[in-house]
Amino acid sequence: MAEKKIAFRNRQDFSKIPATIQIPNLIEVQKRSYDRFLQMDLLPSERDDAGLQAVFQSVFPITDFRNVSQLEFVDYAIGNWECKCGHLKGLHHLRTTCKNCGATVVTDPFHPGDVLCHKCGTFNANTPDFCNKCGDPVGLQLKYDVAECEERGMTYSAPLKVTMRLTIFDKDPETNNRTIRDIKEQEVFFGDVPLMTQNGTFIINGTERVIVSQLHRSPGVFFETANNRTYFLGKIIPYRGSWVEFEYDQKNILYVRIDRKRKFLGTIFLRALGLRTDEDILRTFYTVDRIAVKDKKLYWTLEPGIERPTNLVGLKLSHAIKAKNGEEVAHSGRKVTASVLKEIQKHKISELEIELGDLEGAYVASDVIDTNTGEVLLEANQELTADKLSKMIDAGIGEVNVFFPERDDVGTVISATLRRDSVKTPQEALIEIYRKLRPGDPPTLDTATALFHGMFFDARKYDFSRVGRLKFNIKLFDRQDPTGLDKRTLDPDDFYHTIRYLLKLRRNLGAVDDIDHLGNRRVRAVGELLENQFRIGLVRMERAIKEKMSVYQEMSTAMPHDLVNAKPVMAAIREFFGSSQLSQFMDQTNPLSEITHKRRLSALGPGGLSRERAGFEVRDVHPTHYGRICPIETPEGPNIGLISSLSCYARINDYGFIESPYRRVKGGRVIDYVQVTHAGDSDYRVGDKMEKSEAQKANEELRGRKKRGIELEPYSFYLSAWEEDKWTIAQANAELDEKGKITSELVNARKAGNFVLISRDDIDYIDVSPKQLVSVAASLVPFLEHDDANRALMGANMQRQSVPLLRAEAPIVGTGMEGVTARDSGAVVLARRSGIIDSVDSERVIVRVEGEHHPMQLSREVGSDIYQLTKFKRSNQNTCINQKPIVKQGDHVKKGQVIADGPCTDHGELGLGRNVLVSFMPWRGYNFEDAILVSEKLVKEDYYTSVHIEEFEIEARDTKLGPEEITRDIPNVSESALRDLDESGVIRIGAPVKAGDILVGKVTPKGETQLTPEEKLLRAIFGEKAGDVRDASLTCPPGIEGVVVDVKIFSRKGQEKDERAKQIEGTQIAKLEKNLADEIRILTDERLKRLEGLLGAKVVQADLHDERTNKRLLTKDAVLDRETIERISTRNLKRIKYADKDPRVNEQIDEIEEMTSRQIDVLRKIVREKIEKLQKGDELPPGVIKLVKVYIAMKRKLSVGDKMAGRHGNKGVIARILPEEDMPYLEDGTPVEIVLNPLGVPSRMNVGQILETHLGWAGHELGKKIAEFMVENSEAGQVRKHLKQLFKDTAFVDHVTELDDEMLLKVAKGMQDGVFFGSAVFDGSTEAEIKSLLDQAGLPTSGKTFLYDGMTGDRFEQPVTVGYIYMLKLSHLVDDKIHARSIGPYSLITQQPLGGKAQFGGQRFGEMEVWALEAYGAAYILQELLTAKSDDVYGRTKIYEAIVKGEAAIEPGVPESFNVLIRELQSLCLDVELIKTKEKAAPAPVAAD
C-alpha cells in the first residue's frame, strides 16, 4: 500500500496481492456531489448546467399572465470572496489566462505547480493575485466558522445572492407585437445556503448532520414479465413527470396506463401522438409488402437496390426465380433465406410470381377502393381472403399493400387492438384520454390537447433527464455515446420504439429487466436531493411572482426585489435539512461510525421504498453488488438490505451509477495502465491513458533527449454494472507470475452476473484488490473470510458502536485499513503545509512553514500554521472528542502527515478497543451464554474507562410578568446547595456534581397574588424579593454524576454581561492574543532569517554610528551575524558599508521590512475584529436574554452489565469482575485478562476470532523479545541482525535492510509493545504463517497452553487456547440503562404511570402478571396495584393522608381508566350513568400490632 508510514508504526503485511491503486478518499461521495451542486468557487461563465445553475435556468424566465413583463435569471454568487484584510474582492483574482487558447484557468494559491487549462489541456503558470497588504489570496470569508456555529446553535452557511433582470414590454394592441420599454438588473438576497464542512457534514442549528445518499430506481424504459411470462409490461419512467405503462392481455389487446390511472386502448394513445389513420399505425409497426396483380397472376414486388425488411423471408417459392439472362437464381419449393434474398437483389429482380396460398394470413395495410365506383372493397386491417382477392381482381385493382401479423416480429397485438378501437381521429383520442385521466371534468379539445402535451412534451412538467435518455438509448439501441442526452422530453418515436420492443418480447427478441440490477438503480447524493428541494421552492416562488406581476400597480417603477420573495425557497431548504428522512443526526460515536454514515446508501426516503412494502428481492444481495455495495454491512432489523454501504473502492459516476475499478487483461496477461497527470515535454495530453510499458519507453526517450518526462499515476478502468455485464472478469486472487501472466489455464470469473470457470485467454478484466468487495467497516475485520456472514455483519456493525476509550490502542492484528480510515474520517489533524514544529502543547501545535523559494522572493510560504486542537468536546452521542499531539518540537513534518491523534486513533491509526489477553474456557458458570469474565486489572488500570460528556442548557427569558434572572440568590435554598455556584449563579468548572445538584440558579417572576395587610407590612419591612419569584434552577438530572468541565454563557446584544461571562470572554481574548504573539514572533524570525541571508557574514568596512545618538553600533572589520542584525534598526542597517555592496540591497531591506510590518498589521486587525465580535454579544432566539450551557464529564469505568464485543460478531455482557489473583494464569504466572466461553465459537462459525487470538499472541510475545534484546543491545547493527533473524522469509526483512540506523531504532522501539500485523480481508495470513510466527515467538504452535486455577493453584486438565484479542467496549453501558422509579409523572388522560427511563417511568404490571397474582389469590396486593399504585387519583391522595396520620387502611376509589371508558361511550352518544347502591360495609382488615 502506498500510504505514508506515520510515526514509525510498521505493520507486517501478509498480503500476496499488491494494491495497484490507492483507495479513493472515503468521503469524496458527499463532497463531490455538493461541490457540483453549488459550483460556488466558479465564475458564472465557468458553471456547468448542473445543480443550482440548472434549477434557476429551468424555472426562469418567469412571464406574467398578460405577457408584458418578464423576470430573467442572470447569475448567482454564494458567500463573500475576499482576502484576509478585505482589500482584494472577487473570484476573478483566482484566475489566469491560458497562454495557448485564451480561456480562463482556475489557479490554486495553496498548491505550488502548474495549473491545467481544461479547454485545451495546456499547463500554465499558477499565478493567483496576492494582496499587497496582507499577502493573502482571495478566499471565502464567513461570519461564523464551524466551531462558533456549533457553540451558538447556528447554521454553518453562506449568503446566496441572485442577479435578476426585469424586462418590461410595450404591446401593440393590433398586432400583439412586443417592444422592450425598460430593462432593470438587480442583485437580490435569497437567503443563507448551508455549507458542507471539510468532513462532509452540515451544521444545522448547532448540530452536526449528514445527508444520506438515496438509492432509487433509475429513470428510463423498463420491461418486465407479468403473469408467469404469458405477457409483458413496458414502463417509461421519467425523473419528474407522468409514468406511462404499456401492457397487453391474453386477448392480445394493447393497453396504456398513465400515472397508474384507468387503462385505455393503445391505439387511442397512438392516434393522440399523431398517427391519424389505421394505415399510419399499421405502417409504423408492421413490415408492409406490395402485391401486384397482372393478368390475374399475383406478383410480390421488390425494390431492387433498396434493402428494407420484407415478409418474403421464410416463404417457400411456388415458382422458380430466373434472372433476366435466364439463369435460375432459386428453384421452386426452395425456402427464401437472407442469402437467397441477396441473390435476388444482386440480379435486380423486381417481382416474383406467387400463388394465392402464399398470401395466407395476409391483411391489407391500407383501404382498397374501387376507383370506378368509389366503393371501399377492403378496409385497412381486414384479412385478405380468396373471395376478397377475386373481387379486387374483378374490379381491376392492380396492386394491394399487405402485412402478415402472425409472421411479423411485432405479432398480432396492434392489429387486434385496432379492430377493438372505435375512436377514429386524433381529436377524439385526446378527448377520450382526458376523460380517463380527469373523470368528471367536461373535456374540450383545447384542454385535452394542453393536458396531453404538458404530460410528455413540456420541459417544465416532464424531465426524462440525461440519465433517462442514456438508459433509453442503451436499452433500445444499445448505444452509450453521450451525444443527444440533453433531449429531456419524449417524442412520438420514443413511444413507438418502446411499444415495438415490448411486442417483440413475446418472440424472445430482447430481454426483460431485472429491477434490482445496479444498472437500473442509481444513487441520488446530497447535491441532487437538494437540487430537487430547490426546484420545489422555486416553483412555489414562481406562482407568487406571476401573481405579483399581474396585480402590481406600477410595473414601470418595480424592481426585481419588489417581486421576488425567496421565503418559499429557503423554507423548502430548511425543511429538507431539518426534517427529511434522509437528513440524519450524525452518528458520532467514533470516527468509523462517522465515515460509515457518510458512505451509507438508503433505499428509503421520499421517492424511495417503504420498509413495510419492500420485498425480499430488493433487500437481497445481487451479483451486481460485487465491488459496489458491501454484501456484509447492513442493519439487522426491519431495514435489513434497504440500508447498505458503499464498497471501499466504489465511486459514483456523473449519472449516479456506482462504478467499481478493474485492471485490463489481454491474452491472459494483466496489463498495468497509467494516466498522464503532467505531459512534460511530450505530445501527450493530461488525462491520456496508456500501458505502463509504453509510458516508461516514452519517458526513457525524453530523458535521453534531456527533456522533461511525463508525470503519471496508476489508472484502473471503472465500470458500471451494465458495462460489466459485457465482459468476463477474474477475481483479484487469480495467481499471476512475475510478468503478470495468469498461471492457471482455467480461472474463476464472473460473466453477466454468473460465476463461471473459464479459460484465461477469455478474461477481459481482473479485480483491483480483494478488499474491493467489502465496505470500510467490514474491511477492518481481520480474517473476515473465516467468519460466517451473519457474524461478520454483526462484527462490522458493532465496531461502529465502540466507545472512544481514555487511551486508544491500535490492534496488534489489523488489516492495513486502519490508517486510511483514521485519515479520511477527519478525526486526526493533518499538516496543511510542510514545515518544522515550532511549539507544541496539549491545546495547539504551531508549524513554522518553510519557504522553498529564492531567499529574496517574499513568498506567502512564510509564517506559521496554528492548529487549535479540540479538547474534551461533546459529540452527538455524548462521547468525548479530544485531540492529542503526537509530534515533538523541532520535528520536520510533511504536508498531509498526522500531527495529532483524535478520539479512537493511535499514531494515526484507528484504535477502537484494546488488545487483551484472553483464554477460551468455561469458568464456574460465570461465562455461560456469551457472558464475559473480566479481570479487575482492566478496571484498575483504566483499560476500558471512557469519558462521556453531557450538555445541559438553561435560558433566561423575558416573560409577561418580568424578566427571568440567572442568580445565586434563590429563595428557600440552603447555603450548602449553593456552595459551588459563583456570584453570577453559575457552577464553577471542576465542581463534582450528582443528581439533584444545582448547576445554574434561576428565578422566575410569579403571578401577583392578593396579599393580606399583615403580609404587606412584612413585605415593606423585610424587602419583597423572595415572595414574588420562584426557583426555576437547572439541576443535575438523575443518573448523572461527574465533573463540570466547561461552561458557556451567551448574552443578548446590548445586555450587561455578568462577572462570569466577562471572565470567560477574558480567557478567550487571552488565547487569541497568545496566538497573535506567536504568529508575530514567527514572522519576525523569518524577517531576521531573510536579512541574514542578505547581509550575513559580510565584513564591515567602516565604523557605524547611530544617526540620532551618534552611539557607535559597529566597529570596522566586524562580521555581521544574526544577533548583530537583530539589534540594529532598519534605518542603520541600510547605512552599513561593506565590500561589493549591491545597490539594490537597500531596496530589498525595505521590501522585507514593509512586507513583515504589513503582514503583522493584518494579523492584528483580524484579532481586533475577533475580539470585537466576542465583546459585542450574541444573537439569541427572540425573547431569550441569556443562555447558559454546562458540560459535565462522566467517567465510565468497566462494570458488570456493560456490553463488550470482538470484531467477529462475538459479543457478550460482563457477568463478573474477578480479582486479578483469582483469574486463571499462564505457566509464567501471568493472569489472563478476559475469559470467554469456547461454546461461542463452533455454532457461530466465526473462526476468525481464534486465528486472531493466535496471531495476536505471537505479535505480543515477539514484541517482548525485541524489548528484552534492546535492553542489552542498543546498537543499530545488532538490532538489525536480531530483527532479520526473527522475521526470516518475510517481506519485512527487505524493509529492515533499507532503513537507516536512526529510523531502524525508532521502528524497533515502536515494536516493543508488540509486533503489529496487517492481515487484509481475503488476502490475510495463512495457517502456516501463523504457526511459523508462534514458533519464532517461542510459543506452542497449537496456540494452546496449560492454565492454572487462580483460586486453588491447580493446573487445568486440558490445554487452553490463549492469546491476544482486540476487544471493544460498546456504547450500551449499564450506567445509561439502569434506572429506578419512586413516584414520578403520570399520563395526563389515563392517569397511569409512564414507562421508560427517559420519562422517569415505572415497570408495567401487565395482564399476565395480574393472572399470576390472581392464581395466588393475593387480592389486597392486586387491589393496591390496580388502583392506588396505578390510576386511582382519589386513592393516591387518601394513602398519602393515611401515611401522614399513621393509619394502615387503604380506601380505593374509582380508577381513572374507568372514567375514560365512560367518556368514550358518551362520545358515541351512549348516556352512561353510575348508580351507587348501598352495600353492607365489609369488615375492615385487622391491622397488625
UniProtKB/Swiss-Prot annotation:
Keyword Disulfide bond: no
Gene Ontology terms: cellular component: DNA-directed RNA polymerase complex
One GO biological process term: DNA-templated transcription
Gene Ontology MF term list: DNA binding; DNA-directed RNA polymerase activity; ribonucleoside binding
Coiled coil regions, renumbered to chain: none
Enzyme Commission number: 2.7.7.6
CDD domains from the UniProt entry: RNA_pol_B_RPB2
Sorted UniProt keywords: DNA-directed RNA polymerase, Nucleotidyltransferase, Transcription, Transferase
Entries under InterPro entries matching the protein: DNA-dir_RNA_pol_bsu_ext_1_sf, DNA-dir_RNA_pol_bsu_external_1, DNA-dir_RNA_pol_su2, DNA-dir_RNAP_su2_dom, DNA-dir_RNAP_su2_hyb_sf, RNA_pol_bsu_bac, RNA_pol_bsu_CS, RNA_pol_bsu_protrusion
HAMAP family for the chain: RNApol_bact_RpoB
Family per record: Belongs to the RNA polymerase beta chain family.
Function: DNA-dependent RNA polymerase catalyzes the transcription of DNA into RNA using the four ribonucleoside triphosphates as substrates.
Protein name: DNA-directed RNA polymerase subunit beta
